């Protein structure tokens, strides 16, 4: 099913999807690929860090509950690394209590989507955060050039 695009990805933005649920991975990967994104997959924090070492994605869709290190702890690690801190992290999880949502933002997430996922909503949020990150990067580069 083709979802109406909110905004086409800028030159095939790279999105890392981190989730241990095969059905969620399949659904997200299919939808992202249809929209023109390049998709990287990780099933846990260790794999996610390995993907970051290979290629820094433009955004991360991150489950909070995974085997081993949870998504909140992984997000904190990503945000503590200067070369990765700019990457927007969108949590997607079944944890719906206010304290859990607040923890997602406190750990460095820019957004929080409660499962079950609504693909058009996830795509719209992702496009917005990618656009905001792009504008922020351009501003940082302009300041760097201006000195």
Regions found by a protein language model. Name each.
Residues 26, 73, 85, 96-111:
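Alpha4 helix (beta4-alpha4-beta5 surface) of REC/receiver domains from two-component response regulators
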Residues 26-34:
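Charged docking surfaces used in two-component/phosphorelay signaling
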Residues 55-62:
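Active-site beta3 strand of CheY-like receiver
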Residues 66:
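Receiver (REC) domain active-site loop signature in two-component systems and cognate sites
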Residues 117-130:
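C-terminal output helix
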């Amino acid at each position: 099913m083709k979802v109406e695009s909110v905004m086409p990805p800028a030159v095939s933005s790279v999105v890392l999807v981190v989730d241990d649920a095969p059905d969620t991975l399949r659904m997200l990967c299919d939808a992202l690929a249809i929209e023109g994104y390049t998709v990287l997959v990780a099933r846990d924090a260790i794999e996610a860090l390995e993907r970051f070492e290979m290629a820094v994605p433009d955004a991360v869709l991150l489950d909070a509950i995974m085997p081993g290190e949870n998504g909140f702890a992984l997000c904190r690690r990503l945000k503590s690394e200067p070369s990765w801190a700019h990457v927007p992290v969108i949590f997607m999880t079944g944890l719906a209590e206010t304290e859990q949502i607040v923890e997602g933002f406190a750990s460095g997430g820019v957004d929080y989507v409660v499962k079950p996922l609504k693909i058009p909503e996830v795509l719209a949020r992702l496009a917005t955060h990618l656009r905001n990150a792009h504008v922020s990067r351009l501003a940082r580069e302009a300041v760097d050039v201006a000195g």
